[in-house]
């Protein structure tokens, strides 16, 4: 069809040119004017040639673009950019390379948070959206690329503390994806992106539902996870291409929202995810390992990752291994935590890392360095996370944690349950003087019993913690209610699970309230099969 239109226009332009020149020869005698007319006519035909008229923008995810995407998703950004540069030269009207460059911006800004890089790249958002608008609306990529771009910039803006505009970016992404789902229901990548956003929207607290509904954002954890699973279980070219990205979303949501943590690590093992060469999977496995009390596993993953040139240089590797080593009270933990603080240019994590560094020195009886790390907490800018608020609060208090409880906490966080229990063995709440220490003791004991699968003993200690601390500002009582909810949920006692999830939500004005409320709300949604 395209070749037919080109031939028709070629004949038309040939006729115009011949007729125009024939008529002009009748009236123009000057050889100079004649040459000028010939030149203008020739230029006219070149400028309005069929090739120019039909040089419209396209979305062509060809083999070369697929190769670039695969390199980028492994965090081999330089290799991906080189392939993109070649594609741009060979196919200047293909919009997919510009779309893929947004992934490069995203990974650089999301993981490293360098303000100078942000300043350099922030205008790319508007430029790329305008470029995508030049593509054919008949392609499912017309809306899909814009949705991905807005989604990635929403995450970036959260990292840079611009939560208001991040919310608007998420809304734009959500609505584009929703519209694309309606226009192209068989376009499989919709399930990956829209499914992920459905889950995220499904965790919005009830108090904000009116606002999300007003903005057109309505989600469902159940529906969103079903969409993601449908995508991963399908058998088509798009699943093959977007497989790794979809897995990243799926496992994080399964871990944090569905609370199916064991299934996450079973998936990583059974699917044989390349946690060595794919640095996105390296980060996923190590980060979730640390947050699932598997510090030994995280250290193993990080120590075996491919360190060859070409990967994105990320200070967060030092943070992750520093956390994992601290959770086993290893003497070299401070090396990694200090290196992170020195090299990381962003705000996220910094106060939390400095708090952990202060704990390390405090447990080493190096009070001078412990105090210096605390002082830095108060000097650093805040990204506004709950962990940072807690670190700031502790630093301002001037009070240091009880060393027995701190060691037990770190060892339990690392998955070294027997060692943690041994620290507290033979002690009771009466051995601690301060009310907050008595409260923390019962909570720590409950968590250790819980993690050792001694559920009845855990529930007993959790209930004591709730009774002692439900009106205090520490997070121990609210977290205890959440954990009791988890225990009953696993027993399939959904009615009691909902009672304790709601009890967690009902507790006011305590540390980590937003994140604990979100987890409790997700628990209620699961129990209601929502």
For every predicted segment, state its role.
Residues 57-63, 71, 75-83, 101-270:
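Short coil/linker segments at helix-helix boundaries
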Residues 69, 103, 110, 148, ...:
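Residue-level recognition of tetratricopeptide repeat
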